[in-house]
Amino acid sequence: MRLWTVHPRYLDPRGLVAAWREALLAQKVLKGATTGYRHHPQLARFQAQDDPVAVIATFLVGIAEEAQHRGYRFDTTKISPQRFRARLPETNEQLLYEWGHLMAKLRARAPQFHRQFHGIMTPEPHPLFRIVSGKVREWERT
């Protein structure tokens, strides 16, 4: 499971669909609707919030908006109605760590996306996040 800090625009089609499915799974976990994945490290920043379901729902909206922009049809009725009204702080080094991880994936599976984005030094974050100074998060498996 990977709940990307980077903006969904950087994901190739396969990555965008995977992000959608994994975030839907995360929503299910955060609602308590499944017993698996409850301790997955990618969920830590969502679980730390007062209303984790609202936060993951807002995360899903960002993915769905990118999908719609590309002409994809993701079933947005699967997104919980709660919304997180603020922007979640995430660190610059977490964003850059994930950027490197994504670039490696794109180099292997979607060279055209890699070529399009490889010159970007600091990517935009997912709309849910605002970037603050800091290290890679402890929950990240490096």
Residue ranges and their predicted role:
Residues 40:
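Conserved, mostly hydrophobic/aromatic
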Residues 1-16, 22-25, 29-33, 43, ...:
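Sequence termini and other peripheral, non-core segments
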Residues 35-37:
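Short beta-strand
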